[in-house]
C-alpha cells in the first residue's frame, strides 16, 4: 500500500463511516480495486480509530457528562444498546469475516441499505428525546448496529433508521447513533488488534507513512461527515443516499454477473 492509496482509503473511510452508505462495503470494494492484501488489518484498525476522534471532539460535552455521571440515563441507554451489538458481533464474527474476504454479497447489501434508508425516510417524524427514549428503544437500535457488521450494510444508516422507526426525533436519532458507535468502534479495534497480534504480525520492514496518512485522512473527513450528517438529518434527505447505494449495488451485481468483479 502506498501513501496515495492510503489517502483515498482514509478519506473514504471517514466519509462513509458516518454517511449512511457503508464504510466497510466501500473499503472492501476499494481494497479489491487496489488489489490490497498485505497489512490490511492493521490499516483498518488505524483508520477506524481515526474516525473515532471526530466523535470525541464533536460530542465532548456529552462524553464529559457521561464520565461525571456514569449511571445517568444516557450512559445506561448506551450500555443497553451496546450489549446486543456485542453479542451479535462476537457470536457471528467468523461468518462476517468470511463475507468481508469474499465480497460476494456486496451488491445485494448495498441495495438493502438503500431500501432501509428509503423506508426510514417515510417514517413520521418522532418526538422522543433523551428523556423519553426507553431501554427497549436502545436495544432495538443496538440490534440494528449489530446487524450492520455485514460488509455493505451501513451502520449509521441502520442505526439512524432504527431510531427513527422507534420514534426518536431526527436530531436525537443521529446523536444517539453516533454516541452508540463509540464503544462499537473501540470494541472492533480491540478485537482486530488481538487478531493482528495472534497472527504474529510485526511492524518490522513496514512503511508506516501510509498508515499515518490514512489515520489523519479518516479523522479529517470523518469530522466533516458527522457535521454534514447532522445537517442532513435536520432537513430529511436520507433518500439522496438511497439512490447512490442502489446505483452502486446494481453496478456491482452487473460486474459480478459479467465475471469482472
From Swiss-Prot:
Catalytic activity: di-trans,octa-cis-undecaprenyl diphosphate + H2O = di-trans,octa-cis-undecaprenyl phosphate + phosphate + H(+)
Known EC number: 3.6.1.27
InterPro entries named among the record's database cross-references: UppP
Entry's Gene Ontology BP terms: cell wall organization; peptidoglycan biosynthetic process; regulation of cell shape; response to antibiotic
Segments crossing the lipid bilayer: 39-59, 76-96, 99-119, 173-193, 206-226, 238-258
Residue ranges the record marks as coiled coil: none
Gene Ontology MF terms: undecaprenyl-diphosphatase activity
Bilayer disposition of the protein: Multi-pass membrane protein
Keyword Translocase: no
Presence of keyword Membrane: yes
Keywords of this entry: Antibiotic resistance, Cell membrane, Cell shape, Cell wall biogenesis/degradation, Hydrolase, Membrane, Peptidoglycan synthesis, Transmembrane, Transmembrane helix
Any GO CC annotation of this UniProt entry: plasma membrane
Family note: Belongs to the UppP family.
Protein purpose: Catalyzes the dephosphorylation of undecaprenyl diphosphate (UPP). Confers resistance to bacitracin.
HAMAP family in the cross-refs: Undec_diphosphatase
Name of the protein in its database record: Undecaprenyl-diphosphatase
Gene (UniProt): uppP
Amino acid at each position: 500500500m502506498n501513501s496515495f492509496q492510503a489517502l483515498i482509503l482514509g478519506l473514504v473511510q471517514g466519509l462513509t463511516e458516518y454517511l449512511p452508505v457503508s464504510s466497510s462495503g466501500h473499503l472492501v470494494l476499494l481494497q479489491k480495486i487496489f488489489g490490497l492484501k498485505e497489512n490490511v488489518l492493521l490499516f483498518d484498525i488505524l483508520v477506524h480509530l481515526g474516525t473515532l476522534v471526530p466523535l470525541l471532539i464533536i460530542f465532548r460535552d456529552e462524553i464529559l457528562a457521561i464520565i461525571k455521571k456514569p449511571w445517568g440515563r444516557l450512559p445506561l441507554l448506551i450500555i443497553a444498546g451496546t450489549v446486543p451489538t456485542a453479542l451479535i458481533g462476537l457470536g457471528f464474527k467468523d461468518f462476517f469475516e468470511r463475507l468481508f474476504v469474499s465480497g460476494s454479497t456486496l451488491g445485494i447489501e448495498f441495495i438493502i441499505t438503500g431500501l432501509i434508508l428509503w423506508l426510514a425516510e417515510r417514517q413520521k417524524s418522532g418526538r422522543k428525546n433523551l428523556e423519553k427514549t426507553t431501554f427497549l428503544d436502545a436495544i432495538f437500535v443496538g440490534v440494528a448496529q449489530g446487524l450492520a457488521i455485514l460488509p455493505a450494510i451501513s451502520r449509521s444508516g441502520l442505526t439512524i433508521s432504527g431510531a427513527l422507526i422507534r420514534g426518536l426525533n431526527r436530531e436525537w436519532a443521529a446523536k444517539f447513533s453516533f454516541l452508540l458507535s463509540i464503544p462499537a468502534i473501540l470494541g472492533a479495534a480491540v478485537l482486530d488488534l488481538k487478531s493482528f497480534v495472534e497472527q504474529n504480525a510485526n511492524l518490522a520492514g513496514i512503511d508506516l507513512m501510509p498508515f499515518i496518512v490514512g489515520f489523519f485522512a479518516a479523522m479529517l473527513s470523518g469530522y466533516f461527515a458527522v457535521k454534514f450528517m447532522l445537517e442532513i438529518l435536520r432537513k430529511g434527505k436520507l433518500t439522496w443516499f438511497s439512490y447512490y447505494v442502489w446505483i452502486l449495488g446494481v453496478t456491482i451485481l452487473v460486474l459480478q454477473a459479467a465475471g469482472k468483479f
